[in-house]
């Protein structure tokens, strides 16, 4: 309900289930935001409705979105367009129409309040390249959708992702003193890629510093 239809009541329930109280969950949110480098974000509630001091920026939401797409199974929920609940008695429809209309789009989330206007963090993946776009302050849902569509088109038309390292690819070893083994390997917990312009046809070299 949270991922598909922006259910504010469900967001509160999830917060209370995970942290005991809304306040405790908000403290976790702010701590995680700080860890991710979201320097201009302060959360005051778990549902996102307008509240004094509850604020963020497009850049900070992009940082959060970049992390979100790496969370296991999250995109399985955000890409749902329609979902039945309570044995078919209720049907929720995703406010992010791009997951239905835009090729490769599988998230992430829309939002709207009287202060923020119509906002969206949208992501799409094609041919191994994934991009995230964030828009805030649109005047209508259609403007939000159309502008996000054009931004994603621009990304796919002008940029490409080049994978540098695979997940768990060993890039070096270090000696271990008095350990269970003589050496330990270094490897990324997720694939590592760089974004290049499509006009850049030059050779890419990787240098690993341990």
Kindly label every feature range from the protein language model.
Residues 1-72:
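Active-site-adjacent loops and short helices of periplasmic peptidoglycan-processing enzymes
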Residues 38, 50-210:
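Domain-terminus/edge residues, biased toward the C-terminal soluble/receptor-binding domains
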């Amino acid at each position: 309900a949270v991922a598909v239809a922006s259910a504010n009541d469900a967001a509160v329930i999830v917060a209370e289930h995970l942290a005991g109280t809304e306040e405790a969950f908000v403290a976790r949110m702010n701590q995680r935001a700080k860890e991710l480098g979201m320097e201009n974000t302060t959360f005051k509630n778990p549902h996102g409705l307008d509240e004094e001091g509850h604020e963020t920026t497009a850049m900070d939401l992009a940082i959060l979105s970049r992390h979100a797409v790496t969370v296991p199974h999250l995109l399985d929920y955000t890409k749902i367009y329609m979902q039945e609940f309570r044995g078919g008695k209720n049907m929720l429809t995703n406010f992010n129409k791009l997951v239905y209309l835009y090729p490769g789009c599988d998230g992430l989330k829309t939002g709207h309040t009287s202060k923020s206007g119509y906002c969206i963090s949208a992501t799409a993946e094609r041919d191994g390249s994934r991009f995230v776009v964030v828009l805030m302050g649109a005047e209508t849902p259609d403007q939000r959708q159309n502008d996000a569509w054009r931004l994603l088109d621009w990304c796919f038309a002008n940029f490409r992702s080049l994978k540098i390292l695979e997940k768990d690819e060993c890039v070096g070893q270090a000696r271990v003193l008095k350990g269970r083994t003589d050496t330990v390997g270094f490897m990324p917990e997720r694939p590592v890629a760089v974004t290049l312009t499509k006009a850049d046809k030059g050779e890419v070299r990787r240098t690993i510093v341990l």
